[in-house]
């Protein structure tokens, strides 16, 4: 036992002089540039203490039918369920790492029979051993500590990655839902246009039959009318495609998706994006990058710890009747041993592992910086898209009003023989185009607002 204490004392002295760094803790990245979102006036005006990212997805998306779809997706989506499984695996790894401080205990009983020739006959002799072996690696040089901290970082990383998958899932369902609403609106416009243009076509045919119009006018009018018919077919096909895409996200078979209509949907006039410091705590992909850097940090610590000696305590507690092993058969055996293993030459593997670990840590640091930059860029882009859609919205509304009046007036002039069919066709097609564009712009505004919500870190709660 005296030798054991000498070994431990020498190791502690080695640690005191050289091993301080291997116990260092990772310091999370907590600062970012105040200009991460950009410096334009619109960006600065949108910054406030509050942010739409603090809203839960249920508070942000208030449509009950959309909420129902998102709930179903969160419960059933296979990618999200796989992310949950990864979290459970990391939890198991962390639990095992925490138990690494404890000694390992093995029990390996054995029994046998030997036969001896005694006075002309074989005499069997039964032997047995009941050894209980204990091995304990002392964690003087933070091998287990760094493994535990690394496992904790991996767990946090997988939890944040689950949040990334969830936020992207919420975004995908919401955007596909808005696309369905857009297509429904476009189909509504086309069906209404179909009925109006059919009346115009019948009017033109009547004029032709009475000799007041040329067949060319009828053919041109019918061509425009049939073009609307083909657009109706295309939109209905796109509706089915979007419904199928939502079904895949929900992990269900293709079926009809219930949704509400846009009605009098209005784009928000003001959006709060919060301050840049909130981005680090809100965005799960930034947290993934931070914990990946933390994992690399503890890998480097472990690579450093591999240069230090390994101290093991071994014990044996046994009971047996093997006279060849135990001087006093049937007695108790107790044995203790301490060992120190100091790596001297490992074919350059230890130095190579340390260098690789340092380079990996540097690479993770670069990826973290790029992740933050990408996040700020996404916020800037989404905010710009929101503002463009809001600005164009008033123009499209006015354009539809003007063209509606132009279409009505031109049609009346044609009925009175004061306008040609070309003027009517131009007015009809311009009005249809403006109505379709107005609906598409509303969708672009909704899509941009959803993208901004996700870019700021929303959707995971």
Residue positions per predicted region:
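Terminal intrinsically disordered/low-complexity segments used for targeting and assembly
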Residues: 3-8, 14-75, 236-281, 454-461
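Small/polar (Gly/Ser/Thr/Ala-rich) solvent-exposed segments
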Residues: 81, 101-125, 135-164, 168, ...
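Short segments within alpha-helical structural elements
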Residues: 198, 227-255, 303, 398-456
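Membrane-embedded segments
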Residues: 76, 81-93
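Membrane-embedded beta-strand positions in outer-membrane beta-barrel channels/transporters
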Residues: 70, 129-133, 177, 276, ...
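Periplasmic alpha-helical coiled-coil/stalk elements that build and connect Gram-negative outer-membrane
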Residues: 21, 144, 153, 160-275, ...
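Transmembrane beta-barrel architecture of outer-membrane proteins
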Residues: 66-68, 82, 127-131, 175, ...
């Amino acid at each position: 036992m005296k030798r054991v204490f000498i070994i431990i004392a020498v190791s502690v002295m080695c640690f005191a002089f050289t091993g301080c760094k291997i116990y260092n803790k990772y310091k999370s990245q907590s600062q970012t540039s105040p200009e991460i979102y950009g410096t334009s006036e619109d960006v600065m005006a949108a910054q406030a203490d509050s942010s739409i990212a603090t809203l839960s997805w249920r508070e942000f998306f208030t449509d009950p039918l959309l909420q129902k779809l998102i709930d179903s997706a969160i419960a059933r989506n296979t990618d999200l369920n796989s992310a949950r499984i990864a979290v459970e695996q990391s939890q198991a790894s962390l639990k095992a790492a925490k138990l690494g401080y404890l000694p390992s205990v093995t029990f390996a009983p054995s029994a046998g029979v030997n036969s001896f020739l005694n006075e002309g006959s074989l005499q069997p002799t039964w032997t047995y051993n009941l050894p209980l072996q204990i091995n304990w690696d002392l964690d003087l040089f933070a091998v287990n500590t760094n493994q535990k901290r690394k496992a904790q970082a991996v767990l946090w990383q997988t939890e944040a990655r689950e949040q990334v998958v969830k936020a992207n899932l919420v975004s995908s369902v919401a955007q596909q839902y808005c696309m369905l609403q857009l297509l429904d609106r476009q189909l509504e416009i086309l069906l209404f246009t179909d009925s109006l243009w059919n009346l115009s076509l019948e009017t033109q045919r009547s004029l032709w039959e009475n000799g007041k119009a040329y067949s060319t006018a009828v053919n041109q009018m019918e061509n425009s009318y049939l073009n609307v018919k083909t657009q109706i077919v295309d939109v209905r096909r796109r509706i089915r495609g979007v419904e199928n895409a939502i079904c895949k996200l929900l992990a269900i078979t293709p079926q009809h998706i219930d949704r509400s209509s846009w009605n009098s949907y209005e784009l928000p006039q003001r959006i709060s994006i919060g301050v840049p410091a909130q981005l680090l705590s809100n965005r799960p992909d930034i947290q993934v990058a931070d914990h990946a850097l933390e994992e690399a940090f503890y890998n480097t610590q472990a690579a450093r710890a591999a240069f230090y000696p390994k101290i093991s305590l071994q014990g044996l507690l046994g009971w047996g009747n093997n006279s060849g092993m135990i001087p006093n058969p049937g007695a108790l055996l107790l044995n203790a041993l301490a060992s120190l293993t100091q790596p001297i030459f490992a074919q350059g593997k230890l130095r190579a592992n340390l260098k690789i670990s340092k380079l990996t840590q540097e690479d993770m640091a670069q990826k973290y910086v790029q992740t933050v930059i990408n996040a700020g860029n996404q916020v800037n882009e989404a905010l710009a898209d929101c503002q463009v859609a809001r600005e164009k919205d008033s123009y499209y509304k006015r354009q539809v009003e003007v063209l509606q009046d132009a279409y009505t007036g031109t049609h009346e002039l044609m009925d009175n023989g004061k306008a040609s069919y070309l003027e009517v066709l131009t007015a009809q097609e311009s009005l249809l185009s403006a109505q379709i564009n107005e609906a598409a712009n509303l969708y672009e505004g909704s899509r941009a607002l959803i993208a901004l919500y996700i870019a700021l870190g929303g959707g995971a709660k």
